[in-house]
Amino acid sequence: MNLHEYQAKSLLAGMGMPCPKEIAIQQISQLADVWQHIACPSKGAVLKAQVHAGGRGKAGGVKVLKQLPEAQAFVQQMLGSQLVTYQTGSEGQYVSSILLCENIYPVRQELYFGMVVDRESQRVTFIVSPEGGVEIEKVAHETPEKISSVSIDPLTGVQPCHIREMFAVLQLEHGLFAAFSRLVNQAWKAFNELDFALLEINPLVLRETGEFMCADAKVSLDDNALYRHPELQVLRDETQEDPRESQAAKLDLNYVSLDGNIGCMVNGAGLAMATMDIIKLYGEQPANFLDVGGGATQERVSEAFRLIVSDSKVKAILVNIFGGIVRCDMIARAIIHALNEARITLPVVVRLSGNNAAEGQRLLAESGLTVEAVDSLDDAAKRIIALLN
């Protein structure tokens, strides 16, 4: 579960990490009072549109403003709008709040500081770079030598040697070691106690006073651990999530909306990826990733079809099922039920393979529905594209 910047920094500040003075507003009527508390007469304040996406600055969603009338115009423009960045897609994301931050610039240095769960090593990895304030992907591509990662065994936790290694990479003055060490330990505590899946502070700034400050923060919480944190569950902002993805999560379906026009329903994440790949291989684009899982039932298949056809971009549907534990004849009956129930008129091609595949294909052929059953994934992809065109 992703958090807004102001929510992330509130959690970090609660763990003792240094964050700027800031207040989030949801209505323009709140602006004048908040401006009095946050803005500096000479430097104004930083106003940031709150969305779950990067690239806000380049999209016009972050401004340093010195006068209240300028801030009022910005808030009026942003609140209730759709902010489009390189990470949001063409539809953008809804702006329901604006964060007013004290202007802490100029600063001595901007750093990158991140933490992520490394599933391969089953450890938490710190990622640091002296090049902060820019997209870390750009740094990784252009100057990878400026990024360093330090893997931490969860059984031992952060040790002084780990902190010294990061400190050396950041090329900081010796007198800053105690403050940096304190920051690392606070971040480790927050990451573990609050079950973060990702923490990104970009930039972590070093002020002229020698003080570290989290100028921006991104936090993703581990969905599987949310049951331990009811106080964090209320931080979810469903306006930032695709409605179909939210509905799929409630139904325990793995769904990701994409930009194409061929809806996909598959059992198994790997098979779903292969299905999308072959659609792209033959020149079309998938409209979604949808894994109904190994425990597919008639109800889950029906819900999956409803999700797919709720997307107006979908012009055809490809179903790819490999029957193992799940029998293909059961899936075929579920497909027939779903197509009848939802009155789906779009072209549908079904590839069944494995357990009771022949029986499943017979049921589809005798259903009287305009659904085509094929044996191979290659044939399925070619046929659905032919029907689409």
Please give the residue ranges for each predicted region.
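ATP-dependent carboxylate/acyl-activation modules
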Residues: 1-201, 205-319, 353-354, 358-365, ...
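Short Gly/Thr/Asp-enriched flexible loops that form oxyanion-binding sites at enzyme active sites
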Residues: 113, 327-338
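Hydrophobic alpha-helical segments
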Residues: 311, 342-345
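Cofactor-cradling patches in redox/metallo enzymes
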Residues: 311, 320-330
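Short internal beta-strands
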Residues: 321, 345-354
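Alpha-helical structural signal in soluble globular domains
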Residues: 334-342, 359, 363-367
